[in-house]
């Protein structure tokens, strides 16, 4: 179930403030955030945002096809190590 259209998209205020501060300055550095729940806006395009996955910050370069998605969708939190092997053949 998606978010109601009358509410509009959500992004944390501190993340928007960091994006605005970088758009005013000429240098583009990596923006660290813990806000996986924030929706990607068109003003985020071209920036690299380091999203926290529970262990480290993973850099994500924002492209125009990512607009409307959440930041957390592009950074997995779990690592799959494969299913257990069948040890019956070795015995």
Curated annotation (Swiss-Prot):
Keywords: Ribonucleoprotein, Ribosomal protein, RNA-binding, rRNA-binding. GO terms for biological process: ribosomal small subunit assembly; translation. GO terms for cellular component: cytoplasm; small ribosomal subunit. Protein S19 forms a complex with S13 that binds strongly to the 16S ribosomal RNA. One of its GO terms (molecular function) is rRNA binding. Belongs to the universal ribosomal protein uS19 family. InterPro entries: Ribosomal_uS19, Ribosomal_uS19_bac-type, Ribosomal_uS19_CS, Ribosomal_uS19_SF. This is Small ribosomal subunit protein uS19. The gene is rpsS. Gene3D superfamilies: 30s Ribosomal Protein S19, Chain A.
């Amino acid at each position: 179930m998606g978010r109601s259209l009358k509410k509009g998209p959500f992004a944390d205020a501190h993340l928007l403030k960091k994006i605005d501060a970088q758009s005013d300055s000429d240098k583009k550095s990596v923006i660290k955030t813990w806000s996986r729940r924030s929706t990607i806006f068109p003003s985020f395009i071209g920036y690299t945002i380091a999203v926290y996955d529970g262990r480290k910050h993973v850099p994500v370069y924002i492209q125009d096809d990512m607009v409307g998605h959440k930041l957390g969708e592009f950074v997995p939190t779990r690592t799959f190590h494969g299913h257990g092997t069948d040890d019956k053949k070795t015995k």
